[in-house]
Amino acid sequence: MEMLQGLLLLLLLSMGGAWASREPLRPWCHPINATLAVEKEGCPVCITVNTTICAGYCPTMMRVLQAVLPPLPQVVCTYRDVRFESIRLPGCPRGVDPVVSFPVALSCRCGPCRRSTSDCGGPKDHPLTCDHPQLSGLLFL
């Protein structure tokens, strides 16, 4: 009996600590600061820009009997409200538009991944790095 009471007390204390902090144990989907590499085919430089992207956890479920039932749609942390900013890459030859746009997350949500606007995961062919020499400093429009 004493062992059961001790176990119950330990469980209540551990849950109380999580409730008292009022912070989720895992960060939910929200905008975070990130650095992106920006380059364009035909331009000889790469620039890094600071922006906000969506990151964090979204609740998901998996079926126990996957062979019998169709899979449940999985949600990801994605943009709710987004604006695009543009920069001008220096040194682009004539005939190449030097303007490149990148997303700035204003708010995020958990929802289906849209390949048209998001990286939906999976293996990458190459890391997200610059192919051209990196230039410091930004030329915002």
Curated annotation (Swiss-Prot):
InterPro entries: Cystine-knot_cytokine, Glyco_hormone_CN, Gonadotropin_bsu, Gonadotropin_bsu_CS. It is found in: Secreted. The keyword Cell cycle does not apply. GO terms for biological process: G protein-coupled receptor signaling pathway. Disulfide bonds join C29-C77, C43-C92, C46-C130, C54-C108, C58-C110, C113-C120. Gene3D superfamilies: Cystine-knot cytokines (2.10.90.10). GO terms for molecular function: hormone activity. The keyword Signal applies. Keywords: Disulfide bond, Glycoprotein, Hormone, Secreted, Signal. Residues 1-20 form the signal peptide. One of its GO terms (cellular component) is cytoplasm. Glycans are attached at N33, N50. Promotes spermatogenesis and ovulation by stimulating the testes and ovaries to synthesize steroids. Belongs to the glycoprotein hormones subunit beta family. Heterodimer of a common alpha chain and a unique beta chain which confers biological specificity to thyrotropin, lutropin, follitropin and gonadotropin. PANTHER family: GLYCOPROTEIN HORMONE BETA CHAIN, LUTROPIN SUBUNIT BETA. This is Lutropin subunit beta. It comes from Pan troglodytes (Chimpanzee). The gene is LHB.
